[in-house]
């Protein structure tokens, strides 16, 4: 792993692990301590050759769920203030935010709300003139047609994904080496998705694979419990984490 990769990985971990504004970060929670980025950074044990810094924090981001880089080096983050359960009468207004480090100092200088009005966007992945978003029971494509970093077109790409347990709804979008979009589903979900090739079903945990240009959807792997991380190595083998693999 190169030094750049090590620094990048550590920076991303810091982004998800740390929040800077206690009042905003806790979102009215009072039963856990308020976060303290300075203290948390001081307590981290960092391996030789690695570096950790705070890239972005609340209020730039709120309860981030997933993040991915675009070819320009900007970081797209999906956030949800209502996760894991929206309250009766509450209007869903979760967001996708673009973070950019323009001066190269390792900290986000700008943040732009690319889209709002979402419901528990558990995945975001830049591509095809905008981004793909997991929006509860749907996969959306949000497009920016005029180049102002604001979504001006919203399209439902796929629908019919289960939502019995919001902790297990579809999540973690990744581009695969075959130009397909891979994403996860966990065990307490039953999905029945209509496609041009017929209804595709996944009852329980697994990994989906999707080719946007043809709307071809299939199940890449089954039998998981709480699939979360998914990455590919240099031989295109899948490396998958399961949060409850021992069950």
How does the language model describe each region?
Residues 1-11, 210:
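Bacterial N-terminal signal peptides that target proteins for export
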Residues 9-19:
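Bacterial N-terminal signal peptides
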Residues 22-247:
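Beta-propeller domains with acidic blade repeats across secreted/periplasmic ectodomains
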């Amino acid at each position: 792993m190169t030094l750049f990769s090590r620094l990048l990985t550590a920076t991303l971990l810091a982004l998800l692990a740390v929040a800077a504004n206690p009042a905003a970060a806790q979102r009215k929670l009072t039963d856990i301590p308020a976060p303290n980025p300075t203290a948390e950074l001081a307590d981290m044990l960092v391996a030789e050759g690695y570096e950790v810094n705070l890239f972005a924090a609340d209020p730039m981001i709120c309860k981030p769920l997933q993040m991915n880089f675009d070819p320009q080096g900007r970081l797209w983050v999906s956030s949800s203030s209502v996760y894991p359960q929206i309250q009766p009468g509450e209007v869903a207004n979760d967001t996708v935010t673009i973070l950019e480090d323009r001066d190269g100092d390792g900290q986000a200088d700008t943040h732009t709300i690319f889209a709002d009005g979402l419901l528990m966007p558990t995945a975001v992945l830049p591509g095809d003139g905008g981004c793909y978003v997991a929006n509860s029971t749907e996969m959306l494509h949000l497009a920016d047609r005029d180049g102002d970093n604001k979504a001006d077109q919203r399209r439902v790409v796929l629908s019919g994904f289960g939502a019995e347990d919001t902790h297990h709804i579809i999540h973690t979008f990744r581009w695969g080496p075959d130009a397909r979009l891979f994403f996860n589903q966990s065990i307490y979900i039953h999905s029945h998705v209509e496609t041009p090739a017929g209804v595709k079903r996944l009852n329980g945990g697994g990994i989906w694979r999707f080719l946007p240009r043809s709307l071809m959807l299939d199940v890449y792997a089954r039998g998981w419990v709480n699939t979360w991380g998914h990455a590919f190595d240099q031989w295109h083998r899948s490396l998958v984490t399961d949060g409850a693999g021992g069950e």
